[in-house]
Amino acid sequence: MPPDSSSFTALNLSSTAVPEWMGSFTLAAPPNTDLWRKPPSRDTSTAPILYTALRNPFVAAEVTVSADWELEWDQGGLVIFAGAPPGRIGGAAAAAAAATVTAAQTTTASTTTSTTTNAGPDMVAQGDAPPAYVPPAPASKWVKVGLEFCNNACHATSVCATSDGADWALTALPPHHARRLDLRVKIERIGYALWVWYEDEVSGWKKLREVTWFFWGVEDKAVRVGVYASRPANFGATHYERRHGGPSVTQRNLCVDFEGLEIF
């Protein structure tokens, strides 16, 4: 059964982009969008993402992705975060976050004013105390798995990221699956490890990788799970296209279809 759409947050999308039904929907990724990380903890988080927090400890998630894959690195699939997802929250969620910060600042200002007003005549006037030091939040761990178009063929893809950076792995699909444009992928928690799978229509689920450290030191409430689409390539228009007009494939959005999303 698909998850409730009301629990999802849109990242790098308008808040209205969350579909009413999560069983079948589409995400459109413009050119030059990606979810990636290079040292030192520099995130590229421009890919459209829909994610949700879980009421219960994460068990597994799976979905089928498909698209007209055309450009190098076109991709879409599942993503899981252990910590705050990097990127821009859309619409109402962003406004609510801004309101919370404003309210906190107003409360702090009121407290400071009240303290100054009530100071006795014997107290020595002093400058405002410096703000408390708040260390930056550690970069979140995340993993994405899906279907990616690379070297003119579709592959099962996975990326694992820590605060130090990310790695990228491609797996060739079996010959009987190589010409298909869809793939069902799954992520599953086993102990502290995150197992990454894809489904072969002949032999069933096949292991892509085991991420042994993913859930180590992670609170259940910090886990966020969802889907993403991205088109990292950005080649720009050719001279012919600029002269004759009309959008080329390099300037069009990648529309990724998601079917049968399940999150446990």
Q: Which ranges hold each PLM region?
A:
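Extracellular glycan-recognition regions
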Residues: 1-264
